[in-house]
A protein has these predicted regions:
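Mg2+-dependent prenyl diphosphate-binding active-site environment of isoprenoid biosynthetic enzymes
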Residues: 19, 29, 33-251
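N-terminal amphipathic/basic leader segments beginning at the initiator methionine
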Residues: 2-29
């Protein structure tokens, strides 16, 4: 990497967020991606070039900067987190039949299911490669949370059309599917700053709870927002019988 300065000349928090988002986008565009086979790498490039919010890598940067983490290691972790997030979105969109992601056709919609499976696998592999020279605990926690996300998706599918699901079960599911990655984002920034285990756990819990709030809000917007504003397909939760906070509140009235 060239000289990496992730602290802009501004006292505005919102300007700092935009600066980090731009730096993350630039770094994503520089990830080495082969041109062949196009069947694999064209959809991967398509996903990486998408205009996501970069919420998770930004959180990792903020956590790391607060704890004086090395900026090079922090950028690698942030990119790996964003690739893991996009891997999960590519597969989730296919499983749920969602046709729009980040304002453009989802991978399985633009190509097909087989392409989406392979592209997701490739994104996950690229994420792993970014972590190879970082401390072993970073690699371990990354993969522990990756498995937790898969568990959350498994619970999400199991809960479809099951009217016995409680709000506590729902909260457990979204803590795995959504909260865990935000928890990891906050935690890994702390770990790169060589903080103690108690602080690392607190950072994970902070991110986890942020993720729960984010998912509950997303459940609301899934029903009451507009697809153009959200940049993704909406209403599929109702069609598929997904268990959301609003749906469960209605069931348990």
């Amino acid at each position: 990497m060239d000289h990496l300065n992730l602290m802009p000349d501004t006292n505005s928090f919102s300007d700092h967020i935009e600066f980090l988002r731009d730096e993350i986008d630039k770094a994503l565009s520089k990830i080495p991606i082969n041109g062949s086979p196009k069947y694999l790498y064209d959809p991967i490039q398509y996903v990486i070039s998408g205009k996501g919010k970069r919420f998770r890598p930004i959180l990792a940067h903020l956590s790391g900067q607060a704890h004086n983490a090395d900026p090079y290691a922090l950028m690698k972790v942030s990119l790996a987190i964003e690739l893991l997030h996009n891997f999960s979105l590519v597969h989730d969109d296919m499983m749920d039949g969602d046709e729009i992601r980040h304002g453009k056709p989802s991978v399985h919609n633009k190509w097909d299911d087989s392409t989406a499976i392979l592209a997701g696998d490739g994104l996950f592999s690229l994420a792993q490669l970014l972590l190879t020279d970082l401390p072993q605990i970073i690699f371990q926690r990354f993969n522990e949370v990756a498995l937790t996300i898969c568990e959350g998706q498994g619970l999400d599918k199991e809960f479809e059309h099951d009217t016995s699901i409680s709000i506590n079960q729902y909260l457990s599911m979204i803590s795995k599917k959504t909260g865990a990655l935000l928890g990891l984002s906050a935690e890994l920034g702390s770990r790169l700053g060589n903080l103690d285990d108690h602080t690392n756990l607190n950072m994970y819990e902070f991110g986890l709870n942020l993720g729960l709030a984010f998912q509950i809000q997303d459940d609301y917007l899934e029903i009451f927002s507009a697809s153009a504003m959200m940049g993704k397909s909406l209403r599929s939760d109702i069609i598929l019988g997904k268990k959301t906070f609003l749906m469960l509140s209605l069931i348990h009235i």
